[in-house]
Amino acid sequence: MKHPSKEKVIFHVDMDAFYASVEQYDHPEYRGRPLIVGGASGKRGVVSACSYEARKYGIHSAMPVSWAKRLCPQAIFVPVNMRRYQEVSRAIMKIFDDFTPEKIQISVDEAFLDMSGTERLFGPPARAALLLKERVKTATGLTLSVGIAHNHLLAKLASDFDKPDGLVFVKKGEELAFLDKIDLKDIWGLGKKTLETLHSFNITTVQQLRETDISILQKIVGKAAGDFLYKASRGIDPGIYTERVKNRSISSEVTFEEDTRNIEGLHKTLLHLADQIMFRLLEQGYVGKTVFIKLRYSDFSTFTARQTLKHPLRSEEEIHKIALDLLKKKWDNHSLIRLVGLGVSSLEKKGSHQQIELFCDAADQHSKVENAVQIIRSKGRNINKASLIPHRKNGV
């Protein structure tokens, strides 16, 4: 039980190189070697994740696999095994739930935990974070990084500051000192294009950013980005995550390491997000009727779009198709995208208000497949759909 606390305590918990770390845990022969998790190895494949050993070669997520092979030909390349990652994620999220019911899950490997008032249960924040790290390491063999602060923005920046296996606590009154230690490029959400624009005006540090008048920032990078950077440079939370309504939707999102307009990469990302969301809907026993997407562009402007159906969503394919339609309507195919999010809302417990249908259409068949996948998955067996498995030529 939580007890009243005068001060917010927010943890941002981020698994270290999650997909790659799961593969290295499952395959000891991969440990200590550059490992790349991604799609097809041809020109159109995209890196989904990579180990820290691979990052030393300049490899990052959303990079074409062909580029990664040129940068590090000796790397190990493995396909995405989303069901396995979801299995590990479920175990991790259950541990998080043991620490607080106030959890905002951002993706399979990342969450905000509101630990306000839990000191009587777990001790001071730093001690609670160490206990959390130990629990996860014991249960899964994986490491994570924890950022602790009084708001979501600072907690996120803190978790990124000392990866991997880090623990950084930004106490009240120490915000500016902490911010001045980080590189300007590491301000969360700051894309390459915006960074280049700031550099062209000789704004190269967080302190210089903070000393720049907000009206000038807005003229340089636009109103939305100017407002965001003005607040971020002062450690003020822009409210990106605090406005979420708990238990009203299931969503996931991805922030790209480099702004992108790669349409195939965006489609593949939305497919992975749809798979994650459908898995969580089935696991938690919910159905939903509304699909929504979120796009954040390189100038920090953020847009959402949604579509509500008359019937509950019944498959990952249905969610993905609607997401692609919304993307097509909302995106001009030219603006650089920094973040893409996907979610399902208008939730209700499965079977609570569903009408009996006379005929079983294709969507119903997809729904049955989704449920079968969940049953197999619940028995500890890995299973992936063909759409999430890299294509191979000549049946090899």
Which residues are covered by each model-predicted region?
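DNA-contacting surface of Y-family translesion DNA polymerases
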Residues: H3, H12, D186, T194-I337, ...
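Gly/Gly-Pro- and Ser/Thr-rich, intrinsically disordered tail segments characteristic of DNA damage-repair
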Residues: M1-F228, R234, Y241, A363-V396
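Short, charged/polar surface micro-motifs in flexible loops or helix N-caps
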Residues: F18, S41-R44, S298-S301, L347-K349
